[in-house]
Amino acid sequence: MEWTDIFSGPAFEPVKSRELHLGKDCDLSRPLVVRDTDKLTVEVAGGAALRLVVLHTKPCQAEIRIKLLEGADAELVQLFSAEAFVDFQVEQAAGSKFRMTACQFTSANVRYRFDLNGREASNELDVLFLALEQDHCVVDLRTNHLVPDCTSRSLIKGVASGTGRGEFCGLVYVAPDAQHTDAQQQCRNILLSRTSRIDARPQLEIYADDVRRWGRWRMKRSSICVSAV
């Protein structure tokens, strides 16, 4: 039994459609599961709540688009057990909430782009990647704060062993009028061999005056720990 078979059980609702539209009266008693899609478009209406699991169990290239209307709520889990190249974009209207956990258990290349287009939108992302032996894991993240009063938090954790390689490039962009932005970004990594490597490139591009921002990266190899804030 594969661990992904858990999501074939009665606690989950399989979905084969490439397009999902959740109205405010939509009642989802079970989380939805999308497996090995190459294209997925999701729209969540205000007052609706999406719970979605996205599985990548076969090598593929995928494009995922999610649009949260005003007051919508979404919680996602994304799991990789096969190499995949994924372009993942989210657009958020005012008062919407987006939370996501992603785990790369093998080589993968994922580009995340989050656009916070409405006031008081919130965005949370947690990513774990395991670059073992000869694996190559890439996380490319851009979070765009385009209006005032939005919050974002991203935490990226990586582990590399053998000749495994990990890459993280994260940009937080704050537009000129996006006052009272609260943006947090962290990257913490562990190297288990002298031949493994993880490159972390956190970036800030801020054009507003009243911004709360916090960034940290940490790399650990054996008993040596280096950190910068």
Please report, for each region that a protein language model flagged, where it lies by residue.
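Conserved beta-strand/loop scaffold segments within soluble protein domains that form the structured core
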Residues: E13-A228
